[in-house]
Swiss-Prot record:
This is Phospholipase A2 inhibitor B1. Expressed by the liver. It comes from Crotalus durissus terrificus. Glycans are attached at residue 122. GO terms for cellular component: extracellular region. It is found in: Secreted. Its main location: secreted. Homotrimer; non-covalently linked.
Length: 166
């Protein structure tokens, strides 16, 4: 929004500096201001639409984090790149309701996916006998949301985590 306002002011300033005195009634200024007001209203409407969608998705999942799949099957290294390019991150559920939202995506696609498990003592949902480093150094979640050690070379469902701080 600031960029739009600054662009409008720059255009107006350029117009005035170039000595255009053919606008004694201020028609150009009024036109620029009207355009800026329309853009501000459109931006506000878009922002409110975004918030509505975010709140609805959060309400439906019980989590402020959104877990989204592009339905591709990739290894861990490819997942890191895909999630970063999309503006998200590798899933890292920290609470039970976040893990449930993540597991819902896996159940819907009938697939397993990578996730990151922190060492900070936060919520984890390890399956019985896990973690087992012999199985690999990465972590995957099954369709029920239970965590298992796995190879980072496995090809699993691409799921990225997105969250918003507003």
């Amino acid at each position: 929004m600031r960029l739009i306002l600054l662009s409008g002011l720059l255009l107006l300033g350029t117009f005035l500096v170039n000595g255009h005195d053919a606008d004694p009634e201020g028609e150009v200024l009024n036109s620029v201001l009207l355009t800026l007001m329309k853009l501000q209203k459109e931006f506000t409407n878009l922002f409110h639409a975004f918030l509505t969608v975010h709140k609805a998705r959060s309400f439906g999942s019980g989590s402020e984090r959104l877990y989204v799949s592009n339905k591709e099957i990739k290894n861990f290294e490819a997942l890191k790149v895909i999630c970063k390019q999309a503006g998200g991150q590798i899933p890292s559920p920290q609470l039970e309701n976040q893990n449930k939202a993540f597991a819902n995506v896996l159940e819907r696609h009938n697939k397993e996916a990578f996730l990151v498990v922190g060492d900070s003592g936060n919520f984890t949902n390890w399956a019985a006998g896990q973690p087992n480093k012999a199985d690999g150094t990465c972590v995957k979640a099954d369709k029920q949301g239970f965590c298992h050690s796995t190879s980072c070379d496995d090809n699993l469902l691409v799921v990225c985590e997105f969250y918003f701080i507003l």
